[in-house]
């Protein structure tokens, strides 16, 4: 047993995923509220006087009320050390969300009770399934009129292909929402209105057999609840921890993050059901988190978190052992020993220096420009590399025009920094130079973020000219193919990425297929490692 086992077993590192506006950021805030990390939960709604969400810190986020970066939030609760990877809630930022999911051991899926499973939920769910991590479901906004509860469960099972096991059950919805019935204790948790959820909610626990239960709900609601419980006991899957751990069964909870209904109950159950840090695959095999030897990988790079200092932070997920700020480590890709500078942990925009951290924790270190996403850091005696983080094909492309050529140096620095963070991808025409830059993004809002950040952080103005391309492909067998001799369609464009890899841009799927037909030895792929 590792001498760090006790500390590592306390860790719970998870991401919260959802479709935009399902209430993910509000739920995150309430976790922090119950954990004592904040004293007053602020509404994420966009009035000028409203408090900004704790996990939204970039200026453009505060102005628009969306999360466009991934925040890392740590707090303690009931003996656990919790690391929340708060992923971007806006649908345009799924690639950054994907990388963040690579650092999580489990995921909380937030679903709007009035809308059910939505587009981004499906996409992010597939990523979790691919990683075989446990998935927990919180059906939110039950204080509003919601879809039929059984229909919601059926939709999750059919749309996402995962079995469901409700741990609690809502009593009504909308104006008739009275709380939740806990299937484990056979009791009802009733919640009071807590100043629109800005304070920890107080609740009363009452047995379903208690005559006073009719003070909480009317006889019709009680009869309906009893009928639903009977149906649920006969039809739903039984809780199976092994199936949950494999990502084959999702425990389901109901509540309202805005008013605190069901939030603490969910948090307590979740922490017991979810996993401590999981082993990670590397080129040497699985790396045990309980190992005494330190190891970590970079899953995110964020430049200019402090505008005044133009700093750059590399976020690392610790995979095994203990991090000690005084220790020397080995940067595998850089092939050199080093000390990690200014190690810190984050609470949105605030940060504090850390001397030690354990497997499951996320730390940010000062990056002088040597780290890339996916890099491995380990103890000097262990020179292995964790599996790389894939780069996925962007869906939108534009040519970048610099409006003031005298600011070329700032422009090149800025756009390269933003690209290294993974918010955008940069391409150049084959045999071109930095004078002609094509930017690819997963969602069109990232174009706005690019313009905003270049102007506000680097004092550079650009114009973006949209390009008609909708598909991009890496060449998997580039060593065996002469790129110059690829016979494509007239609208195909040959480009390279920042690593010098050749790629092909296509206007439509037909062009992709035609190029593959004309070049039978060519192997194209939608992502690059």
Residue ranges, per PLM feature:
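Structural and coupling elements of P-loop NTPases
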Residues: 1-529
């Amino acid at each position: 047993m590792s001498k760090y086992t006790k500390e590592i077993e306390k860790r719970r590192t998870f991401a919260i995923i959802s479709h935009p506006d399902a209430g993910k950021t509000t739920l995150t805030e309430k976790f922090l509220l119950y954990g004592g990390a904040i004293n007053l939960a602020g509404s994420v709604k966009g009035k000028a006087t409203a408090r900004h969400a704790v996990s939204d810190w970039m200026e453009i986020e505060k102005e628009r009320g969306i999360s466009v970066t991934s925040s890392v939030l740590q707090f303690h609760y009931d003996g656990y050390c919790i690391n929340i990877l708060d992923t971007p809630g806006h649908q345009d930022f799924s690639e950054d969300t994907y990388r963040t999911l690579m650092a999580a051991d489990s995921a909380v899926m937030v679903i709007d009770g009035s809308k059910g499973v939505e587009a981004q939920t499906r996409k992010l769910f597939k990523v979790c399934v691919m990683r075989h991590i446990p998935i927990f479901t919180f059906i939110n906004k039950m204080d509003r009129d919601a879809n039929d509860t059984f229909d919601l469960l059926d939709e999750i099972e059919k749309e996402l292909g995962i079995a469901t096991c409700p741990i609690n059950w809502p009593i009504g919805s909308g104006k008739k929402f009275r709380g939740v019935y806990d299937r484990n204790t056979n009791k009802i948790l009733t919640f009071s209105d807590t100043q629109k959820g800005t304070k920890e909610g107080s609740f009363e626990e009452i047995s379903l057999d208690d005559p006073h239960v009719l003070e909480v709900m009317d006889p019709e609601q009680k009869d309906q609840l009893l009928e639903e419980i009977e149906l649920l006991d006969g039809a739903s899957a039984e809780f199976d921890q092994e199936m949950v751990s494999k990502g084959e069964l999702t425990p389901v909870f109901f509540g309202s993050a805005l008013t605190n209904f069901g939030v603490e109950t969910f948090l307590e159950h979740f922490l017991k059901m979810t996993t401590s840090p999981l082993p990670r695959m590397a080129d040497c095999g699985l790396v045990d988190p309980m190992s005494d030897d330190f190891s970590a990988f970079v899953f995110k790079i964020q430049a200019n978190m402090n505008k005044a200092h133009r700093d750059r932070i590399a976020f690392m997920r610790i995979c095994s052992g203990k991090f000690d700020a005084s220790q020397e480590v080995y940067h595998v890709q850089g092939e050199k020993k080093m000390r990690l500078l200014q190690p810190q942990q984050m609470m949105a925009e605030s940060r504090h220096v850390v001397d030690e951290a354990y497997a499951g924790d996320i730390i940010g270190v000062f990056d002088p420009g040597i780290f890339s996403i996916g890099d491995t850091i380990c103890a000097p005696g262990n020179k292995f590399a964790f599996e790389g983080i894939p780069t996925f094909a962007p869906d939108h492309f534009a040519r970048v025009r610099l409006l003031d050529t005298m600011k070329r140096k700032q422009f090149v620095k800025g756009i390269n920094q933003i690209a290294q963070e993974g918010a955008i991808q940069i391409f150049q025409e084959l045999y071109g130079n930095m004078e002609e830059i094509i930017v690819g993004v997963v969602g069109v809002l990232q174009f706005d973020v690019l313009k905003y950040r270049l102007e506000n952080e680097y004092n550079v103005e650009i114009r973006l000219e949209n390009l008609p391309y909708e598909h991009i492909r890496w060449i998997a067998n580039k060593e065996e193919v002469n790129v110059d001799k690829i016979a494509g369609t007239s609208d195909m464009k040959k480009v390279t990425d920042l690593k010098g890899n050749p790629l092909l841009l296509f206007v439509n799927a037909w062009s992709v297929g035609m190029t593959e037909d004309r070049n039978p030895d060519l192997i194209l792929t939608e992502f690059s490692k």
